[in-house]
Design a protein with these regions (language model features):
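PP2C/PPM-type serine/threonine phosphatase catalytic domain
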Residues: 1-256
Length: 256
């Protein structure tokens, strides 16, 4: 498989940017034996105020990528080790700068191999797969939203109450340098197909509906990942949501 990638970001209505994202591509000529990683994409949405959130997301991306590249073993083993390194990076920063205590970040990291991919995520940053006209979220949502939706399904809350609940966007798990409460680590290789589009995003993307995200991908995917990423960010801006959060997208297109 051939992979093309683009990263785009918008600060939104915030006075600072707390998102971070990075990609790493394997050097040309990397042997195909075993389970070689061709592309690694990671996105982090920081929290903890102007300085803390930005520091946290940068540390998470940097620590995750460095450990994954260095680590040996299966993709699953490497992703787990990289997540632990990212979590350790937060702990180390807080140890030497106690004023940063309370900072943290979401994380979604995806390793792309020759014909499949693997991921790990913590928090609420979504990972989408667009394939043949349909889009699905692949990773778990570690915010309170799924909990509230279960309460709606059981009749204990109305949909309106769930939508208005102030806890809706609270995180049940995040990379904060302590034990991780919830981790979504893909259990088996996820087969890739030519013309797949994979999107990692921070939760600012939720200012537009999933059906709109899918429509944009369908309209722009043949123009490449940069055009698709630009269109997604433009749609978020055009939504003009009050107090718009930072939005970052990493768009990966898969070719034969």
């Amino acid at each position: 498989m051939r992979f093309e990638v683009a990263i785009r970001a918008s600060q939104g209505a915030r006075s600072y940017q707390e998102d971070a994202a990075s990609v790493w591509s394997a050097p040309e000529g990397t042997p195909a034996a075993g389970e070689p990683t061709r592309l690694l994409a990671v996105l982090a949405d920081g929290m903890g105020g102007h300085a803390g959130g930005a520091i946290a997301s940068d540390a998470v991306c940097t620590g995750f990528e460095a450990q994954y590249i260095e680590q040996q073993g299966s993709a699953r083993q490497r992703l787990k080790a990289a997540l632990n390194a990212a979590n350790g990076a937060i702990s180390a920063l807080v140890a030497v700068q106690p004023q940063l205590r309370g900072m943290g970040s979401t994380l979604v990291g995806v390793a792309f191999h020759d014909d499949h991919a693997s991921w790990v995520s913590v928090g609420d940053s979504p990972l989408y797969l667009y394939r043949r006209g349909e889009m699905a979220r692949l990773n778990e949502d570690h915010s309170m939203a799924p909990v509230l939706e279960k309460l709606v399904a059981s009749g204990r809350l109305t949909p309106e109450e769930a939508d208005d609940d102030p806890r809706r966007h609270m995180l049940r798990s995040a990379v904060v340098g302590e034990d991780l409460d919830l981790v979504d680590l893909s259990q088996s290789p996820w087969p890739l197909q030519s013309e797949d589009v994979v999107v990692l995003a921070s939760d600012g993307i939720h200012s537009i509906a999933d059906i709109e995200i899918a429509r944009i991908i369908a309209a722009y995917r043949k123009d490449g990942p940069a055009a698709t990423a630009d269109a997604l960010i433009a749609a978020v801006r055009e939504a003009n949501v009050p107090h718009q959060d930072n939005t970052t997208v990493v768009v990966v297109t898969v070719g034969a």
